[in-house]
C-alpha cells in the first residue's frame, strides 16, 4: 500500500473518521482543491441592502437543509414576505427629491462615481408603480414567488395528495396577495385553479388577534424608533466625495441615504445597477446597519411589545404542531410583510442580541442582520418532523425552524435529529415564555382574541385570481 494511503488510514483510525470520506478516491497527485478557500458572502451587497433588495438565502450554520436521516417532514407552517417590489410612495418622494439635486447642476457629462448617469434612467416608470411588486428582470418579485412555490412543491409535495383542496392565507395588501397567488401557481401547477383556496385576511386592526398582521396601537416602547436619525458618518464622506466629483451638486448625508435607498431597490426591477458602485463597501455596510436598527427598534426585539405581537402566530402555530397533520392538516402557507415576520422571531426568542444595538456605531457580529432575516421574499418555515430512533435521540416528533432556507437552531433546544427540538420541549418553552397579546397591546374586547382562520377557512377558488385591474399605488386591497 502506498505510503500516502497508509498515512490516511492511520489518521482515520486515530480519529475514528472514515479513511475514504470527502472524495478520498481522488488521486493524491491532483492540484485541484476539493473545497474553495474563498468565502465572500460578507462582501455581497445583497447582505447590506437591509430589507430592500432581492432575496438571498440566509448564511447557514452548516446544518443540512434536507430532513435528518430517519426523519420525514409531516407538517409545514410557512410565513413569507411579499416578493421584490418598487419603493413605497413615501420613499419614492424622498428619492425623487435627492435625484432632483443630482440633476440640478445641468451638466452634460457626469464624472467620477456618477459617470454612468450620462446613460442612466430611473427604474420606476411612473408614480403608479410605487408599492407594486416588480415583474421585470431576473430578480422580479412575481418570478421569485412562483419559483419559491415550485421549489416547495419539490420539497413538500409529498404532503399533498393531488386531490384535496388546500387553503392558503394572505394578508389583504395588494402585493402580498399577488405574491400568494404566484406562489400558489408555482406549488400547485395546473391544479391551482381547482385545488388551492386563497383566503384573504384583512389587515384592519379590528381583526384583533385573528390576523396575519396584528397591531399594537397602545405600544409604549417606540421612543427609540421614533428618534432614529438614519445617519452614520460614512454618509457624510460619500456626500463630500460625490460633490467634489460633480461641483454644484450640494448633496447632504440625508440625500446620500435616500440615494442608497434608491440603489437598494434597483435590482428588484433590473438585472444590473450601476448605483451599487457609486458607494463604497464601507458605505454599504453602514447602510445595512442603519436598516438593522430600523427593524430592531421599530418591529423587532428592541421594542418590548413586539414579542407579544409575534406571539399570536407563534401560539397558533404551536397548536397546529400539537394537533399534527391528521387533525389540523399538513400544509399552511401564509403571506404577509417583513414587519410581521420580525415580531414572530422576537416571540420565539431567536436572533436576540445580548444587548440593545448601539445607535452611533456599527455593532459588528450582532445576530440581527436584516439582510439575513427579511430580504424581499424572506420566509420563516416551521417543520414538524416524524423521526425514528437514533443513537442520539428517541423516536418521536420534533420541530425545526428554517429561515430563508437555512436551519435556525431553536436556542438551547437542539437535542433532536439535525439539531431539531423535541415537540414536547418546544411546547414547554413557548408556553412558559410567550407573552399575552391581548393584554400587552390592550386589544379591544370587541375584537377577536385569538387566531382562528387556520381552522375556519373557505375552500372556494373565487379569490385565486384578480377580478379587477391593479390600482395606482395599490396598498390595502380590501379598502
UniProtKB/Swiss-Prot annotation:
It is an enzyme of class 3 (hydrolase). InterPro entries: Acid_Pase_AS, His_Pase_clade-2, His_PPase_superfam, Histidine_acid_Pase_euk. It catalyses: 1D-myo-inositol hexakisphosphate + H2O = 1D-myo-inositol 1,2,4,5,6-pentakisphosphate + phosphate. Residues 1-19 form the signal peptide. Pfam families: His_Phos_2. Its EC number is 3.1.3.8. Glycans are attached at residues 106, 191, 227, 250, 315, 425, 442, 458. It comes from the Eukaryota. The keyword Electron transport does not apply. One of its GO terms (cellular component) is fungal-type cell wall. One of its GO terms (molecular function) is 3-phytase activity. Keywords: Glycoprotein, Hydrolase, Signal. The active site is at residues 82, 338. Belongs to the histidine acid phosphatase family. PANTHER family: ACID PHOSPHATASE PHO11-RELATED, MULTIPLE INOSITOL POLYPHOSPHATE PHOSPHATASE-RELATED. Catalyzes the hydrolysis of inorganic orthophosphate from phytate. This is 3-phytase B. It comes from Aspergillus niger.
Amino acid at each position: 500500500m502506498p505510503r500516502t494511503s497508509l498515512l490516511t488510514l492511520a489518521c482515520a483510525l486515530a480519529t475514528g473518521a472514515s479513511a475514504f470520506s470527502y472524495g478520498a478516491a481522488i488521486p493524491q497527485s491532483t492540484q485541484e482543491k476539493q473545497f474553495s478557500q474563498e468565502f465572500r458572502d460578507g462582501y455581497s451587497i445583497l447582505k447590506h441592502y437591509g430589507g430592500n433588495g432581492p432575496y438571498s438565502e440566509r448564511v447557514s450554520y452548516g446544518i443540512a437543509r434536507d430532513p435528518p436521516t430517519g426523519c420525514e417532514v409531516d407538517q409545514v407552517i410557512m410565513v413569507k414576505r411579499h416578493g421584490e417590489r418598487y419603493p413605497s410612495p413615501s420613499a419614492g418622494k424622498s428619492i425623487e427629491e435627492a435625484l432632483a439635486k443630482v440633476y440640478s447642476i445641468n451638466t452634460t457629462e457626469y464624472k467620477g462615481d456618477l459617470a454612468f448617469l450620462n446613460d442612466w434612467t430611473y427604474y420606476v416608470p411612473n408614480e403608479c408603480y410605487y408599492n407594486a411588486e416588480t415583474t421585470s428582470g431576473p430578480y422580479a418579485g412575481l418570478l421569485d414567488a412562483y419559483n419559491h412555490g415550485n421549489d416547495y412543491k419539490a420539497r413538500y409535495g409529498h404532503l399533498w395528495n393531488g386531490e384535496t383542496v388546500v387553503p392558503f392565507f394572505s394578508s389583504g395588501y395588494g402585493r402580498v396577495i399577488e405574491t400568494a397567488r404566484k406562489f400558489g401557481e408555482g406549488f400547485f401547477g395546473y391544479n391551482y385553479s381547482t385545488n388551492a383556496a386563497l383566503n384573504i385576511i384583512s389587515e384592519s386592526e379590528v381583526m384583533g388577534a385573528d390576523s396575519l398582521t396584528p397591531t399594537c396601537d397602545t405600544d409604549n416602547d417606540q421612543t427609540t424608533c421614533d428618534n432614529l436619525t438614519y445617519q452614520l458618518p460614512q454618509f457624510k464622506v460619500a456626500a463630500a466625495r460625490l460633490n467634489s466629483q460633480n461641483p454644484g451638486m450640494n448633496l447632504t448625508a440625508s440625500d446620500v441615504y435616500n440615494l442608497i435607498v434608491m440603489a437598494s431597490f434597483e435590482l428588484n426591477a433590473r438585472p444590473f445597477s450601476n448605483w451599487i458602485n457609486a458607494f463604497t463597501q464601507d458605505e454599504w455596510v453602514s447602510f445595512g446597519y442603519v436598516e438593522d436598527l430600523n427593524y430592531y427598534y421599530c418591529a423587532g426585539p428592541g421594542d418590548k411589545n413586539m414579542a407579544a405581537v409575534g406571539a399570536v402566530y407563534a401560539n397558533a402555530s404551536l397548536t397546529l404542531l400539537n394537533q399534527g397533520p391528521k387533525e389540523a392538516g399538513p400544509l399552511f402557507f401564509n403571506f404577509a410583510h417583513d414587519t410581521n415576520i420580525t415580531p414572530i422571531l422576537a416571540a420565539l426568542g431567536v436572533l436576540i442580541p445580548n444587548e440593545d444595538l448601539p445607535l452611533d456605531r456599527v455593532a459588528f457580529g450582532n445576530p440581527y442582520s436584516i439582510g439575513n432575516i427579511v430580504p424581499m421574499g424572506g420566509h420563516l418555515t416551521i417543520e414538524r418532523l416524524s423521526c425514528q430512533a437514533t443513537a442520539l435521540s428517541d423516536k418521536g416528533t420534533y420541530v425545526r425552524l428554517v429561515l430563508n432556507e437555512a436551519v435556525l437552531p431553536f436556542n438551547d433546544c437542539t437535542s433532536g435529529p439535525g439539531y431539531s427540538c423535541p415537540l414536547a420541549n418546544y411546547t414547554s418553552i413557548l408556553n412558559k415564555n410567550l407573552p399575552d397579546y391581548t393584554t400587552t397591546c390592550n386589544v379591544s374586547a370587541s375584537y377577536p382574541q385569538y387566531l382562528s382562520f387556520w381552522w375556519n377557512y373557505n375552500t372556494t377558488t373565487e379569490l385565486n385570481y384578480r377580478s379587477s385591474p391593479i390600482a395606482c399605488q395599490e396598498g390595502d386591497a380590501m379598502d
